[in-house]
Amino acid sequence: MPQLVPFYFVNEITFTFIILAITVYILSKYILPRFVRLFLSRTFISKLLG
């Protein structure tokens, strides 16, 4: 019965927050700046050509 094991839910919540924090860190550090640089280069090229 899950009611008898309160540490199971604490464990799930802890690991969920850790995985979410790692995912947000990886997204903000590595993946999102590539999209920002791509968007900036596209707008710069379109301003040069237009």
From Swiss-Prot:
Indicate where this protein is primarily found.
mitochondrion
Q: Which GO terms describe its cellular component?
A: mitochondrial membrane; proton-transporting ATP synthase complex
Q: A Pfam family name for this chain? A: Fun_ATP-synt_8
Cystine residue pairs: none
Report the superkingdom from the record: Eukaryota
Which InterPro entries would you find in this protein's record?
ATP_synth_su8_fun (IPR009230)
Q: Name one GO molecular function term.
A: proton-transporting ATP synthase activity, rotational mechanism
Topology in the lipid bilayer is annotated as:
Single-pass membrane protein
Protein localization: Mitochondrion membrane
This protein's UniProt keywords: ATP synthesis, CF(0), Hydrogen ion transport, Ion transport, Membrane, Mitochondrion, Transmembrane, Transmembrane helix, Transport
Residues annotated as transmembrane: 13-32
What is this protein for, i.e. what is its function?
A: Mitochondrial membrane ATP synthase (F(1)F(0) ATP synthase or Complex V) produces ATP from ADP in the presence of a proton gradient across the membrane which is generated by electron transport complexes of the respiratory chain. F-type ATPases consist of two structural domains, F(1) - containing the extramembraneous catalytic core and F(0) - containing the membrane proton channel, linked together by a central stalk and a peripheral stalk. During catalysis, ATP synthesis in the catalytic domain of F(1) is coupled via a rotary mechanism of the central stalk subunits to proton translocation.
Q: How does it assemble?
A: F-type ATPases have 2 components, CF(1) - the catalytic core - and CF(0) - the membrane proton channel.
The UniProt family comment states: Belongs to the ATPase protein 8 family.
By what name is this protein known?
ATP synthase protein 8
**Organism the protein comes from:** Podospora anserina (strain S / ATCC MYA-4624 / DSM 980 / FGSC 10383)
